[in-house]
Amino acid sequence: MSINKILSAADITKALGEFKGADSFDHKKFFHMIGLKKKNAKDVEAVFYILDKDKSGFIEEDELKSVLKCFAPEGRDLSEKETKDLLTAGDEDGDGKIGVSEFIQLVANS
């Protein structure tokens, strides 16, 4: 499934523009700007599986680093700090990766 079947390409482009600068990424603001916060759990789960590029059932640190590129090719890589901050925010059980239920909760808490 394409991310643009779930979220507006215009909203994604606007949000990516907001976070172009290094260390400017705020996942709460990003999820709100792209409209993910308003989506139901099924749609949020579908986005999770798009972000889980290796289909492991988890979003690992290396996938988080390039998470913005999953929304649009012009997205940038997150800095190491941004990546760690996002992982810390979403990794409720401390296993170093974000599972689908953790991702749904991360979006809900944004």
Curated annotation (Swiss-Prot):
Pfam families, per the entry: EF-hand_7
SMART domains noted in UniProt: EFh
Residues holding Ca(2+) 1: 52, 54, 56, 58, 60, 63
Keyword terms of this UniProt record: Allergen, Calcium, Metal-binding, Muscle protein, Repeat
GO molecular function: calcium ion binding
PROSITE patterns tied to this protein: EF_HAND_1, EF_HAND_2
UniProt binding sites for Ca(2+) 2: 91, 93, 95, 97, 102
Cellular component GO terms held in the UniProt record: cytoplasm
Reported temperature dependence: Thermostable between pH 4.0-9.5. Average melting temperature (Tm) across all pH values is 71 degrees Celsius. Lower melting temperature in acidic pH 4.0-5.0.
Residue ranges occupied by any EF-hand domain in the UniProt entry: 39-74, 78-110
Role summary: In muscle, parvalbumin is thought to be involved in relaxation after contraction. It binds two calcium ions.
Family listed: Belongs to the parvalbumin family.
Record-given protein name: Parvalbumin alpha
